[in-house]
Regions:
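Hydrophobic residues in beta-strands of the RecA-like P-loop NTPase core, especially within AAA+ ATPase
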Residues: 92-93
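Conserved P-loop
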Residues: 1-79
Length: 123
């Protein structure tokens, strides 16, 4: 039960955040459980917001370089289990170039251990 990690990259203003928001919209329309992360280093549009000129704003979870992504997801999955929610299927990460090497390793562990697919968007 291994998940996949995909990396979508492009230059600035190439539509990466637009693609992330369109993907999130599609997941929401089809009731596919997902979370969105972005680095707290990117605070151009606000701390917990991803912005696209075409699709507007969407809330996300802002993570600092000291956050442990594996621990965040493990605790989230435990809470889903306790309240009977469907388990997480996808994680979308915006501005992934700002993640630490350790956080990238944590994403790989999340995909391997929990079978969650991850799409990272960045430069």
């Amino acid at each position: 039960m291994h998940g996949k990690i995909l990396f979508k990259y492009g230059t600035m203003s190439s539509g990466k955040s637009l693609h992330l928001l369109a993907t999130a919209h599609n997941f929401q329309q089809h009731s596919i459980p997902f979370l969105i992360f972005k680095s707290s280093i990117d605070d151009r549009d606000g701390k917990d917001v991803i912005h696209s000129r075409a699709l507007g704003d969407r809330e996300c979870i802002s993570v600092s370089p000291t956050h442990n992504l594996y621990k965040i997801i493990a605790e989230y999955l435990d809470s889903c289990f306790l309240i009977g929610e469907e388990t997480l299927k996808w994680i979308l990460v915006d501005e992934c170039q700002f993640l630490t090497e350790k956080q990238v390793e944590e994403l790989a562990a999340i995909a391997d251990k929990f079978g969650i697919n991850i799409i990272c968007y960045g430069l």
